[in-house]
A protein has these predicted regions:
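Predominantly soluble domains enriched in secretory-pathway, periplasmic, or organellar proteins
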Residues: 1-328
């Protein structure tokens, strides 16, 4: 019965303008936001109208995105000029730009501490930005290749995957590395944290690991396609969604730590956005040289209910307790 409820189905396959070349996708103010470095644009896709409804142009190499739902603000890493754009999600306008020392790649806003974090893959650093000052206040030299990051509210620490070292670093409020989990696998990238179960899920080469979030001990190992990077948690549905570069999306049963369902899509993409309020998954990617948006949903959710719910964008998308920066 659980397996039937968890099965994914493709709701729509939609053409997007331009050539493929997406960096990150996320939800903001009920819309799907996509960064496109190739065209130096940020595009806003409406799940209801199923088309691009806004576009932010003339920005330099947009990459990672993070959202402060409470203030209606979105932050976008601009790798081309070492800065972070501050965007108002009510009208999709750039309010200001914050300079940083190192080329930013991924961002994470932590509402509990009112802190913005930015990784630099090029310079192997982690920057801390104080938004009250609109300034970078600290740079942590990692001497490793940073990938995904999330905040563990229970332990009040930032967790950061170090891909080339095969480690997960734990960083405290004073911006010091206070611990490292060594995973028995190569190339850890995406993460998701289940606060209730105290399980940390980590994408590694050909698997997703379930770790004890307090000790780092491996609890389970779930086989996955190569290139699986993006992980998105649905605690209400007891599911973990994982996207691989070949376009397949996995639904992992968190009760049994097994893949409940795998759905190959018609596009090649590696970043996903999940709208927990409406149970919809968005995967932008490419197919035969053209840009596409795949919309997926668990088979138990009807199309009518999804569209009725999605037609009320004023309803804020819930923020999970574990804030996560998606894999580029």
């Amino acid at each position: 019965m659980f397996g039937l409820a968890a099965k994914l189905r493709q709701v729509a396959l939609i053409d997007l303008p331009g050539s493929p070349g997406f960096s990150q996708v996320t939800m903001a103010n009920g819309q799907v936001v996509i960064t496109r470095p190739g065209t130096n644009t940020i595009e806003v896709f409406s799940p209801v109208k199923r088309r691009i409804i806004a576009r932010i142009s003339q920005i330099n190499d947009p990459r990672g995105i993070t959202v402060d739902n409470d203030s209606g603000t979105m932050y976008v890493a601009l790798a081309g000029n070492n800065s972070i754009a501050v965007v108002d999600t009510r009208n999709w306008s750039v309010e200001k730009v914050i300079p940083v020392q190192h080329r930013p790649e991924k961002l994470l806003w932590v509402p509990q501490t009112k802190t913005l974090y930015a990784t630099s893959v090029l310079d192997r650093t982690l920057s801390i930005i104080d938004l009250r000052l609109s300034a970078e206040t600290h740079v942590l030299e990692l001497n490793a290749l940073p990938q995904d990051m999330l905040y563990d509210g229970a332990r009040q620490t930032l967790l950061l995957t170090l891909q080339d070292l095969g480690q997960i670093a734990s960083i405290d409020r004073s911006n010091k590395i206070i611990g490292r989990y060594k995973v028995v696998a190569s190339e850890p990238t995406g993460m998701a944290l289940d606060e209730q179960r105290r399980r940390l899920y980590v994408a590694v080469r050909y698997a997703v690991l379930a770790l004890n979030a307090d000790t780092g001990a491996e609890v389970a190992r779930i086989p996955a396609p190569g290139g699986t990077d993006a992980l998105v948690l649905d605690p209400g549905g007891n599911l973990l969604y994982a996207a691989a570069g070949d376009g397949s999306v996995l639904a992992i049963d968190l009760n049994r730590n097994v893949v409940d369902h795998e759905l190959p899509t018609d596009v090649k993409g590696y970043s996903i956005a999940y709208d927990p309020a409406h149970k919809m998954i968005f995967l932008p990617g490419g197919r035969e040289g053209r840009s596409k948006m795949v919309i997926l949903s668990p088979s138990g959710v009807t199309e009518t209910n999804r569209l009725q719910n999605a037609a009320s964008p004023a309803e804020a998308t819930p923020q999970s307790a574990a804030q996560t920066a998606m894999k580029k």
